[in-house]
Amino acid sequence: DAAGRIEAYKRIAAIETTSDAEDVLDELIDRYGSPPKSVQGLVDVSLVRVTAARVGIAEIVQRGDQLILYSDIVGPKQLGEVMEKFPHRVLYNALGRPYFSLRVQKGESPLVLLRDVVTLLPGAQTQTKQ
């Protein structure tokens, strides 16, 4: 029913922790059975969005094979671990509105890459496991 779907979308949008995401998925499974990949994708996007905001990412944009993450807080010092894990794929730009970008490789999921990068930033680990 439409009211149930709207409520589910509201619950997904309110996700703030991994535990919240698990609770929402469990509830959806109890009510409707195994959720389609699109619903799992919404849960994943919601969790990554919240985690990114907590570590100082103000906006995320995908342009072609580039993920662009805007932040006034995250700089080269905080990107060390990201640059080690993804060598030759990270570019930092401090001119104008500061951002860093990552190249998405052929066949790679932009969402998985984004999740992996965001969880490497300082503060992400303590925030997502609650």
Task: Go through the PLM ranges and name each one.
Residues 1-130:
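Accessory helical-bundle/CTD segments and flexible terminal tails appended to RecA-like ATPase motors
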